[in-house]
Structures are given as C-alpha cells and as structure tokens.
Amino acid sequence: TAPNADTLYTTAFFDVGKEPWVLSIPDMKGRYALFPMLDGWTNVFQVPGKRTTGTAAQTYAITGPGWKGTLPAGVKEYKSPTNIVWLLGRIYCTGTPEDYAAVHKLQDEFKLVPLSSYGRPYTPPAGSVDKSIDMKMSVRDQVNKMSAVEYFTLLSQLMKDNPPAAADAPELARFARIGLVAGRDFDASKLKADFAKRIPEVAFDRIM
C-alpha cells in the first residue's frame, strides 16, 4: 500500500490498557478527511471522517477491550479490540502553500489525551528509552536475531493484551500445537528442537 499523494497524515500510537484516550477532531469545514483506527494487528475497527461521521467537530474515547465506565457528555465510545491502537488520519490538501498552511492549522487543533486529563491542560510525560534495545538496528534484524523460543515468548506476552481476532481461530488452533496459545505464557516444551532450528528457513521459503 502506497501513501496518499494528496493528503497530509496525522498519526499517533497509544496504549488504552490503563485507561481510554480521548480524540478531539476539530471542525473540518467540509474538507475531506478520514481517521482510521487500527488495532494491534492493523485491523481497522473504526473510521470517523467525512464519509462516515461528517466534518463537524467530534470527540471520541478509544477504550480498551476490558474497559467499563462512564464517559463525559458528548464523548462517543469506540472500543478497540486490543490495547495497542494506531491512529492513521489523512486530510485532503491541494498541495498549494496556502492549503498546506490551512491543513497544518487544522492539525494543530487536534487533541489526544488520556481520559483522566480530558478537559484540562495536558503535557505528555517525558519518554523513556529501553537501553536493552539497539535503536540503530532495524526491526527486521532484531527479529532475525531472536531464537524461536524468544520470539514466541514475546509474541505470547503481546497477545495477552492484544488478543487476536475471532476470525483467526483456525490459525490459532494450529499455533497451539507448538505451545502458542493466546492469553497464556508460551509453552516451550511443545516446540520441538529440530523444528525450532528450521523456523527461519521455513519462514524464508514461504516468503520467497
């Protein structure tokens, strides 16, 4: 999939595991825009925008799969199937300097804050760096360095907070044969040593 040539992107990654996040979209004044929300598996679960919800100002609370609670008046709930959420917004732009400025002004009016900070000034906390991760190494190379057990152990932890879709049940049944079950720790005893060694070769053969 190629990036759009006639839109400017507005994107964010956030975790709704601890609490919902609230997205405030300004009045787009009829301008075409869409704001797909993707779960941890990049499945789109909601798409507010001109075609679906119009261009007036609107506010949404993106909640996690296990969240239950009350939202402020005027805030609509969008429930994410996973804790990890990717907002991948696109706003139409003609490409002229004047329209770039107009879209940038709209982008500056967007707000994305934790529910506990909604309606109040919010300053994101300083980020932290995991020093155990080589930030100069590509993701592909980092994954390729992992053993099969390391990879499936990490995947099982991620699947606890980011459950696979129900439509993936047939594949999940196959994964269980090697000890990978959604919601549980990885059972390395079910992964045969000879198969673990062959996994990189099998993966490469399937891709090629």
Predicted regions: what is each one?
Residues 1-208:
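A compositional/structural signature for long, glycine/proline-rich flexible linkers
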